[in-house]
């Protein structure tokens, strides 16, 4: 398979970025210009290359806006936002450059949002302890409205995505098909993690309850939006796919789109680590100090591992690798002793996907997708679908990167079916 970089991680992220081109997140010429300046496993060259393109796209957007070119300005601002997002991507979250660059990504995106065909509402969802969850509610333009009220897709970020990046999948396509799409960041995501240091939480059903309550209140306070809170779907990819399944235990959620989820983060970790050594540590034969030293040394010698360890520690609110790995065990669909199985609580329609191109970076079809499908005992076979493509063009990579247009098509075909939406053939 062709690669853009000899670094597996860099190639994956470059494919992820280029894959947003169909929805306005990247330009091929800008992509080629940046890639030619990036050195293998060199985060500084990555950052310099993408910051150059971000600032360039921002200037183009400003020039187009000054000239009155609404469409061209919007497109340039979208690209600038996406390039600013990836500029600090290879840095650890404690790097002082990260937050200002993400804030620039947000600023560029908001400039694009006011130029979109449908209304975009910037929302702050009340969470807890005075914290709010930021998001964008993308509404269908008048020409794309369906008969009746507007169904809603709630789209949660994963471990490393942002609410701005989420636009390039469902935020772009959904409103054009008559859906309202809420792209949001929960605890441990976006600036809530990078700036406020709020970690991820495994029981995302608690977060989902806050989101549903917010939509109820918004629908009541703004009845002219005609939001259909009786037709709510929850979507997410990778870690977000796990979150979507936890959210689907809420009876208000009528459909779940779980893209390449993991069943157990700890088990996923074991599948990518020296399993025997991890088991010895987990059983107490290897002390924490030895394990932490080993992990830190390994991270310094392997860029991808070091990056993942840094992200994991910040996402889990852990100072040491041992604390991080222990917290991984909380992120599971396996029920605690004596509890009702989590997947038994799901009764809505479920669309499950898995990676199948031999590059299952952060999920496994066999250990996660198919296992979850088998354990959804209270969802009739007619209400659950599985899609595990093997070719990259079909969505074989993790989170379906490089094939988001096809993923969007399959997603909304599924939602149309279960939300009883009929469309005439063209």
UniProtKB/Swiss-Prot annotation:
Keywords, alphabetical: Hydrolase, Virulence
Provide the coiled-coil residue spans.
none
Renumbered to this chain, the signal peptide range is none
Q: What class of enzyme is it?
A: hydrolase
Molecular function as annotated in GO: hydrolase activity
Top-level lineage group: Eukaryota
Under InterPro entries, the record lists: AB_hydrolase_fold, FrsA-like, FrsA_esterase
Q: In which pathway does it act?
A: Mycotoxin biosynthesis
Q: What is its EC number?
A: 3.7.1.-
What SUPFAM superfamilies does this protein map onto? Answer: alpha/beta-Hydrolases
Description of how the protein assembles with itself and partners? Homodimer.
Function of the protein: Alpha/beta hydrolasee; part of the gene cluster that mediates the biosynthesis of pyrrocidines, fungal natural products containing a macrocyclic para-cyclophane connected to a decahydrofluorene ring system that show potent antibiotic activities toward Gram-negative bacteria. Within the pathway, pydG catalyzes the Knoevenagel condensation that affords the 3-pyrrolin-2-one ring, using as substrate the polyketide-tyrosyl acyl thioester product of pydA.
Q: Which family does it belong to?
A: Belongs to the AB hydrolase superfamily.
Question: What name goes with this protein?
Answer: Alpha/beta hydrolase pydG
Question: Which species is this UniProt entry from?
Answer: Acremonium sp
């Amino acid at each position: 398979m062709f690669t853009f970089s000899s670094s597996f991680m860099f190639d994956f992220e470059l494919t992820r970025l280029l894959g947003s081109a169909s929805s306005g997140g990247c330009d091929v010429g800008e992509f080629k210009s940046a890639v030619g300046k990036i050195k293998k496993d060199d985060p500084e060259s990555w950052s310099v290359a993408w910051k150059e393109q971000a600032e360039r796209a921002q200037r183009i957007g400003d020039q187009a806006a000054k000239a009155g070119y609404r469409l061209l300005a919007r497109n340039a601002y979208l690209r600038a936002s996406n390039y600013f997002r990836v500029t600090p991507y290879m840095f650890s979250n404690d790097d002082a450059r990260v937050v200002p660059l993400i804030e620039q990504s947000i600023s560029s995106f908001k400039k694009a949002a006011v130029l979109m065909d449908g209304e975009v509402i910037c929302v702050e969802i009340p969470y807890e302890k005075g914290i709010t969850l930021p998001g964008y509610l993308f509404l269908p333009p008048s020409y794309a409205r369906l008969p009746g009220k507007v169904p809603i897709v709630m789209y949660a970020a994963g471990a490393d995505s942002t609410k701005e990046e989420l636009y390039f999948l469902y935020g772009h396509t959904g409103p054009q098909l008559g859906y309202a799409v809420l792209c949001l960041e929960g605890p441990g995501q976006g600036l809530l993690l990078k700036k406020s240091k709020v970690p991820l939480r495994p029981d995302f059903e608690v977060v989902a309850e806050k989101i549903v309550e917010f939509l109820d209140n918004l629908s009541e306070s703004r009845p002219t939006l005609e939001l259909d809170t009786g037709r709510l779907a929850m979507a997410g990819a990778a870690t977000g796919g796990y979150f979507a399944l936890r959210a689907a235990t809420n009876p208000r959620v009528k459909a779940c789109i779980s893209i390449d989820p993991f069943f157990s983060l700890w088990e996923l970790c074991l599948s990518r680590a020296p399993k025997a050594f991890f088991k010895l540590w987990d059983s107490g034969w290897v002390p924490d100090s030895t394990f932490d030293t080993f992990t830190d040394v390994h991270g310094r010698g392997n860029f991808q591992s070091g990056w993942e360890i840094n992200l994991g520690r910040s996402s889990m609110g852990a100072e040491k690798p041992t604390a991080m790995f222990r917290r991984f065990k909380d992120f599971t669909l396996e029920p605690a002793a004596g509890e009702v199985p989590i997947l038994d609580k799901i009764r809505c329609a479920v669309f499950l996907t898995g990676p199948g191109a031999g590059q299952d970076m952060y999920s496994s079809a066999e250990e996660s997708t198919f296992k979850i499908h088998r354990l959804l005992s209270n969802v009739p076979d007619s209400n659950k679908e599985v899609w595990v493509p093997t070719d990259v063009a079909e969505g074989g990579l993790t989170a379906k990167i490089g094939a988001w247009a096809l993923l969007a098509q399959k997603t909304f075909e599924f939602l149309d079916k279960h939300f009883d939406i009929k469309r005439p053939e063209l």
